């Protein structure tokens, strides 16, 4: 998976409407609605860049790679989805805000898919969605300590598993037929 700082650097140079966490959350929400790469770019960038520019093309290649990696991660049975967030070398409040931004982006991307996506969710799937809504409202008011770090890690894992669960409800994986 691409590094948060690398993706953030690319988005800063294009320029983007969001940070890397929110952009990745939007991407995952859009993927649940089977949206494509260009739709994600429209939601993420201030304007569509000139693809003929070599520097722009290199930057777009990074975003294309993130799109493809995320698509594969969401559509495999190994539950390998990684949530793109600031790494541990970033300040705790920055990581917490990154998680909230990721959830905001996910909700935005999922909302673009329309009401039919939400209707496909079971009661448990809607509870997952409600949890992400609550997490999207987290702020800077937590001091970092061992307990908050543990809670943060648990929230990240809950977000990851919730998205995988909702994706499975909206887009059930098609298992290959078993040969007897």
Spell out what each predicted region is.
Residues 1-103, 107-180:
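Domain-length accessory/inserted modules outside core catalytic folds
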């Amino acid at each position: 998976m691409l590094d948060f700082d690398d993706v953030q650097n690319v988005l800063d140079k294009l320029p983007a409407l969001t940070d890397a966490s929110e952009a990745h959350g939007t991407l995952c929400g859009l993927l649940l609605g089977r949206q494509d790469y260009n739709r994600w770019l429209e939601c993420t960038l201030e304007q569509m860049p000139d693809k003929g520019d070599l520097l722009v093309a290199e930057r777009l290649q990074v975003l294309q790679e993130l799109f493809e990696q995320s698509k594969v991660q969401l559509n495999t049975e190994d539950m390998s989805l990684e949530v793109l967030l600031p790494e541990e070398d970033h300040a705790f409040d920055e990581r917490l805000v990154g998680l909230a931004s990721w959830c905001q982006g996910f909700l935005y991307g999922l909302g673009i898919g329309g009401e039919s996506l939400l209707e496909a969710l079971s009661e448990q799937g809607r509870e997952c969605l409600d949890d992400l809504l609550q997490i999207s409202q987290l702020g800077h008011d937590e001091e970092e300590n061992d307990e908050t770090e543990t809670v943060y890690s648990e929230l990240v894992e809950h977000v990851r598993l919730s998205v995988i669960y909702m994706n499975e409800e909206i887009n059930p994986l098609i298992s290959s037929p078993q040969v007897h």
